[in-house]
Amino acid sequence: MTDAGLRRLKIHIACCYNETYSKDNLPEWLTTDYLPYLKDEELDDISVDKMTLEDREAWTDNNIAKLLEIADKEIISSVAEKPISLLASVLEIKDALEQEEYITYLPIPIDGSNNGWQHLCAMSKDKEAGELVGIVPQDIQKDFYVQCAKDLIKRVPDWFEERQMPMKHIRKGIAKRGSMTRAYSAGAQKIAENMYLDCHVEGYLDKYNITEEDCELLAKHLIKAIDKVCAGPLQTMKFLQKIAEAEIASEYSKNIKQKSIRWTTPSGFPVIYEAFVENEFKEKAIISCSKRKVKPILTKEDGSKEETDTIRIQHVGKEPTDKPKIRSFMSGISPNFVHSMDASHMARVIAKWDGDFGAVHDSFSVHACDVDELLDLIKEEFITMYSYSNFFEVIERMIVTNPDNFNYNQPRLGSLDIREVKNSDYFFA
């Protein structure tokens, strides 16, 4: 176990436990003054995973006795955010501290900070949005969901004033999922459904008197808030939709009977995107039960029950046609393209990585002593992918089959220098 590996293990342990501190009771060992940050974000407390990397490491150092006790007694901690991962990690650090030479086998995960928005920011060179998703270096990691929540509150102040929801509950129940999925073109209806479900899971429906109608209202305003916070990325999504329109819905595309959108990702993966109109059909069938000793029981509309000799089945199915479904192309091009770029980034990283590697969606994992090396490679490949003066031209070359058929003006580029990500602690963390 190297010193760098031990540091990364300590950071991981701190995030697995993830203790929360009130702004009025911040510990003395902190190396950073979080009060201005908490005031600006309108938060009353801070969890360890929102602190600097130095303070995450310091948390483990200052709680080592408690952590070693968890290891000695093999405790599944009820107060830890990730109790199983915590136990595995403290068993690891116990052996590492006690043995002069120690080989670690535990995978240490590093997670992307809003990957979809990261790619959209890089395409549009949106520096302001890049500051919120870990592309631009920050002393303290900014919270993208809080920024969206703050703008949302300004749009419907009376609603939030009436309920007196603390920011951390607004972030978790109202803003988080919608802000995350909007990068993949989630609409107001889906955002409202997810918002209602999240509030139900967290117990906010009764606590703050939140209805489905409230979520429908908030979802519409949340989309406007996201548009304000992430202007560049949202324009990029609209640009991709215009390309889809030209490729599938234009007179030119209809004349040549174009039925798919195709591109090749930076990793060399060929994408064929298809979506077809489906015709609905119905089939009816009757199953005879006359020879069964125990007859099926049917419940009538009035609630009464009776035995039956037959069961009637009605199946509704869908069969695809060869007609392109324009609406699906329009709504799906942005998430499919962004996901393909995200997958391409991971593929390029894996292709150059010469060691053990694990991945779950946007979470990469390697052994503790290799984390810093992996982070360098992740940043290097991201920079390489987006080191173009105008990535909108790259997108057109990737997707547009006939430049004469596409005359939509490209969105205005921001001032982001993609090389800034090299010095960011929170691009993946």
Features from the language model and the residues they span:
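Conserved catalytic core of nucleotide polymerization and phosphodiester-bond processing enzymes
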Residues: M1-A429
